[in-house]
Amino acid sequence: MSKFIDRVVLHVRAGKGGHGCASVHREKFKPLGGPDGGNGGNGGDVVLEVDPNVHTLLDFHFHPHAKAGNGKPGEGGNRDGKMGSDLLLKVPDGTVVLDRDGEVLVDLVGAGNRFVAARGGRGGLGNAALASKARKAPGFALLGEDGEERDLVLELKSVADVGLVGFPSAGKSSLVSVLSAAKPKIADYPFTTLVPNLGVVASGDTTFTIADVPGLIPGASQGRGLGLDFLRHLERCAVLAHVVDCATLEPGRDPISDVDALEAELAAYKPALAADAGLGDLADRPRVVILNKTDVPDAAELAEMVTPEFTARGWPVFQISAVSRAGLRPLTFALADLVREYREAHPKAAPKRPVIRPIAVDESGFTVHPDPDEPGGFIVRGARPERWVRQTQFDNDEAVGYLADRLARLGVEEELVRLGAEPGAPVTIGDVTFDWEPQISAGVDMVRTGRGTDVRLEQSDRVSAAERKHASRVRRGLVEDDEQR
């Protein structure tokens, strides 16, 4: 039997984007073929998908690192790099994804639901994509971006309609085994059940699931016993059923005190998904009291004594015996009625046809602030300038000049001048710090330098038709050579 794991920490890393290619087309009789470097492929995503055939997070317990494929670099001949392969991870129904700070990112309920845990990096553009009228043959390309990388916490919260709560050895597992076809481990010692057991119960035309949660003890909401680890499996339950051991001989225990102690723990526990599930706190869920083991001598008499107390609280009470199966039929009908009422009050939303709409993303904004750690320095923050820096190959002068042009067009340079930045001031963008040299005053010279232009366009050794005609006339003596005049 596989080990049940309901909480893991998963480190996900998406694939890196491939670098763009800086290449010039080479073909016979075409000395100026132009740039033909392809773009790099995007990195693969790490995706979580609900699979109804998966029931535990065991795979992630033994393999806590997940990495998607990297994108391939672009090649000459306008060949784009291959995209990195996505990594699809199967998770059980009811998996909750949280970040390291405990914030819920997504609640995966329903077969086929997906969540992109880490997005792959964008591939860099090749020099063919960077070519323009002013930059006919760029001698550089853009680098691919790194993919997202982060730690996620996966918690499994059972998807059941009815949750059985009670002290250890109250008979919860036995009840699940007789109400459904489930075969949980049953033994006569505390904490026999260490993992939640799910069973499917059919009553008339209603079918519902029932969950046997490991035994709770006072202090469970603070982590005593196994309660803190398994109370979360009750968060999705629409009905809570107290299973009370009427045959216990433990000193200081009786059905009323047992239920009161468990109610205190349920009231102290605050479900993280209460608002999302629409069920409210555990203390507000419908209750059913199941007085078990009434086939034991004196247990039936005790059950009769405590029944009025629970009835006065407005809770239905059922006296049963999981061993002899006495009283199970009315209990099953009552649970089915409560589940049916909940489903009628909370109908499932009809599946909507997915409509894909582009999301407008404004990356034009940026901020410039003085650097508190560097006198006279500045820090530039913004999605676009930081991405440009990550894509720049700083050992290529053309690439650095292209970055400077882009920052100037975005308005970063004007903002630095407005804030009083001096030439040579250290400016930090992302993880890169450089000495700033203003280019606004040299804007005309910047255009004349032909940055990113193939030098062969300016230095051509080809002889024109007029020059060939003049040379022929010189050889025949029809005209004098210009150099001999």
Curated annotation (Swiss-Prot):
SUPFAM superfamilies: Obg GTP-binding protein C-terminal domain, Obg GTP-binding protein N-terminal domain, P-loop containing nucleoside triphosphate hydrolases. One of its GO terms (biological process) is ribosome biogenesis. Residues 2-159 form the Obg domain. The keyword ATP-binding does not apply. It is found in: Cytoplasm. Mg(2+) binds at residues 173, 193. Residues 358-438 form the OCT domain. Its cofactor is Mg(2+). Coiled coil: none annotated. Residues 457-469 have a biased composition (Basic and acidic residues). Pfam families: DUF1967 (PF09269), GTP1_OBG (PF01018), MMR_HSR1 (PF01926). It is an enzyme of class 3 (hydrolase). Residues 160-340 form the OBG-type G domain. It comes from the Bacteria. GO terms for cellular component: cytoplasm. Its EC number is 3.6.5.-. GTP binds at residues 166-173, 191-195, 212-215, 292-295, 321-323. Keywords: Cytoplasm, GTP-binding, Hydrolase, Magnesium, Metal-binding, Nucleotide-binding. The keyword Hydrolase applies. Belongs to the TRAFAC class OBG-HflX-like GTPase superfamily. OBG GTPase family. NCBIfam families: Obg_CgtA, Obg_CgtA_exten, PRK12296.1, PRK12297.1, PRK12299.1. This is GTPase Obg.
